[in-house]
Swiss-Prot record:
Residues 20-29 have a biased composition (Pro residues). Gene3D superfamilies: LysM domain. Keywords: Acetylation, Phosphoprotein. It comes from Bos taurus. SMART domains: LysM. The modification Phosphoserine is found at residues 5, 24, 34, 58. Residues 1-40, 194-215 are annotated as: Disordered. InterPro entries: LYSM1-4, LysM_dom, LysM_dom_sf. PROSITE patterns: LYSM. The gene is LYSMD2. Residues 72-116 form the LysM domain. This is LysM and putative peptidoglycan-binding domain-containing protein 2.
Amino acid sequence: MADSSPAPSLRAGGPREPRPSAPSPPPPHSRLGSEAEEAELSLSLARTKTRSYGSTASVRAPLGAGVIERHVEHRVRAGDTLQGIALKYGVSMEQIKRANKLFTNDCIFLKKTLNIPVISEKPLLFNGLNSVDSPENETVDSFSHEEELVAAGEDVSPLSPQELDVQPMQPEEVSARDFLQRLDLQIKLSTQAAKKLKGESRDEEGLYTASLYHS
């Protein structure tokens, strides 16, 4: 009879090493997340607009603490230039263009007044609804008033040094003179009252002494 024993499953030379498995593909949800991030990044880059020459897009840098931007009204006159106005108020021509929506430098003559964005370091004080005028606003208003007088042909005569020295001293001199006069009057009244009281006391002592003598 033939041998019916099963053939050995292992060959001579020992067991066979397992083959390395191929890397598994990434799960679908991770690929979807990365694609969504890339799409969002591309949209954010597309929203960022580059500024071209003559653009009136209002792109403002964040102001620091205690720095504010206010607008000063400037009347356009014959002979004004955008560069001269910018140098006068200490701002750039692009800031004036953005504030007034101007496309070229010659467009300033299309407007009667221009809004000049002036940056100040002192914050404005508010009393509910209306703002309190700061000393800087008063300086700008007085300067514009003098310009209007000069443009109208009126001479603005500056004050002489003697007038500047005399004017603020007048209220102080009057108040000091009044104070000294009042002080002298009080001293006189006090002296008279003291003399009167002293005389009355002497009369009373004399009457008392006379009454004792007669008694």
